[in-house]
UniProtKB/Swiss-Prot annotation:
This is NADH-quinone oxidoreductase subunit A. GO terms for cellular component: NADH dehydrogenase complex; plasma membrane. InterPro entries: NAD(P)H_OxRDtase_bac/plastid, NADH_UbQ/plastoQ_OxRdtase_su3, NDAH_ubi_oxred_su3_sf. It is found in: Cell membrane. GO terms for molecular function: NADH dehydrogenase (ubiquinone) activity; NADH:ubiquinone reductase (non-electrogenic) activity; quinone binding. Its EC number is 7.1.1.-. The gene is nuoA. The chain crosses the membrane at residues 7-27, 63-83, 88-108. It comes from Polynucleobacter asymbioticus (strain DSM 18221 / CIP 109841 / QLW-P1DMWA-1) (Polynucleobacter necessarius subsp. asymbioticus). Pfam families: Oxidored_q4.
Length: 119
């Protein structure tokens, strides 16, 4: 077993670590830093970070999270469909068109109901 064969792998790992760490250190060293109380305070979704954990907050955050999950799942279904489109033929194409139409109808419904308005 010749360890010289593993040199490119070691070099690849070292370059990858360097690409990740060098910009961080350069930014830390070269970037201007003028911290004040406002910049050092934690920001969490527009609320004070150190309040009661059981405080009420707007239900629209839940709605946006649910909508994000739904459209994220739609994207998760679209990728394998696009990869296998040649193999599944017209039936697969038609079923995905129906799937997308259902999502479009649902999106238009929540849009018309005003669920996306942040007023």
């Amino acid at each position: 077993m010749n360890l010289a064969n593993y040199f490119p792998v070691l070099l690849f790992i070292l370059v990858g670590i360097g690409v990740g760490l060098v910009p961080m250190f350069l930014g830390k060293i070269l970037a201007p830093s003028k911290p004040d109380a406002e910049k050092l305070s934690p920001y969490e979704c527009g609320f004070e970070a150190f309040e009661d954990a059981r405080m009420k907050f707007d239900v629209r955050y839940y709605l946006i999270a649910i909508l994000f999950i739904l459209f994220d799942l739609e994207t998760a279904f679209l990728f394998p469909w696009g990869v296998a489109l040649r193999d599944i033929g017209w039936f697969g194409y038609a079923s995905m068109v129906i799937f997308l139409l259902e999502f479009i109808v649902g999106f238009v419904y929540i849009w018309k109901k005003g669920a996306l308005d942040w007023e």
